[in-house]
């Protein structure tokens, strides 16, 4: 059994209704902690009640309450729909309209799940907030550090780079040293019916996978057609709205040409989609904004060799970073990388430790 090293205390567990957070609640309850389960209703969950493998659906709320009842712990469902729409859904829609590729799970962790839920946990008198994320919190010489989960296949550190130092001190991640199989075995040991429940796969507020319908519902008439232009300057055709395209996309362009073409750049101001050969996707350096830094302070223009991830599914790449201004950094790859997309996150690592990260801007070269 994993022990958090804490004395018996009051811990709020963010219970999504899945196996991970359910196992966390059971584990902490067995260790003698005063556990309070909280499940967030984040959107019109009626849309997804019948949808399998979607997070935060009505079934998930039911499952979380069922687990809490089995453990004999208090459980609350909090209506965060308005907070979620303002902080996550509206941001998601506006990001697409700006020609970006958004990352709503990071925005959700940053705002609703950590900022707002930590505030609620403190109001309930809780000493800590525990989640089912596969990351590790390690106490270093200068305070808490965020590290990758031991299981590379389940590591979620990329999605938690916006966690602040203050939040990290309050948070607990009991599953960071486990594999998914070990978590399921733990849930089975506790007799939890969700032990074999499938992982969520979809963006929770898009249960059918059709993000364009969500955008058009919130921002009607957002699919304005425009020009598709080759990076060499000549026009190739017409696009159906920039929300339908992302950097690196090859399929669905509707263009006949003598070589494969990829989306290289999206210009929301002029409503233009630029395409080119695969080589045009190569990137040497770019700028990130709204940097959240968790390590020792670095000076302006000081260069640091690190590893960076620009997509959750891509392996880390060696790069050199340098800070300028209050919240920006230049990231320069040691070897060129393909398809760096504005709106995605760039997360910075030193080995297993998350040093920080920021949002990729259009300043890409």
Swiss-Prot record:
Keyword hit for Transferase: yes
InterPro entries (alphabetical): MnmA-like, MnmA-like_C, MnmA-like_central, MnmA-like_central_sf, Rossmann-like_a/b/a_fold
Signal peptide segment: none
EC number: 2.8.1.13
GO molecular function: ATP binding; tRNA binding; tRNA-uridine 2-sulfurtransferase activity
Reaction(s) this enzyme catalyzes, per UniProt: S-sulfanyl-L-cysteinyl-[protein] + uridine(34) in tRNA + AH2 + ATP = 2-thiouridine(34) in tRNA + L-cysteinyl-[protein] + A + AMP + diphosphate + H(+)
Keyword tRNA-binding: yes
Keywords: ATP-binding, Cytoplasm, Disulfide bond, Nucleotide-binding, RNA-binding, Transferase, tRNA processing, tRNA-binding
Residues annotated as the enzyme's active site: 108, 204
GO CC field: cytoplasm
Coiled coil ranges: none
Binding site for ATP: 14-21, 40, 132
Region (Interaction with tRNA): 154-156
Main location (coarse class): cytoplasm
Subcellular location: Cytoplasm
Top-level taxonomic group: Bacteria
GO biological processes: tRNA wobble position uridine thiolation
Disulfide bonds: 108-204
Annotated site location: Interaction with tRNA: 133, 344
PANTHER family reported for this sequence: MITOCHONDRIAL TRNA-SPECIFIC 2-THIOURIDYLASE 1, TRNA 5-METHYLAMINOMETHYL-2-THIOURIDYLATE -METHYLTRANSFERASE
Family: Belongs to the MnmA/TRMU family.
UniProt cross-references to NCBIfam families, sorted A to Z: PRK00143.1, trmU
Job of this protein: Catalyzes the 2-thiolation of uridine at the wobble position (U34) of tRNA, leading to the formation of s(2)U34.
Name this polypeptide is given: tRNA-specific 2-thiouridylase MnmA
Species for this entry: Rickettsia africae (strain ESF-5)
Gene expressing this chain: mnmA
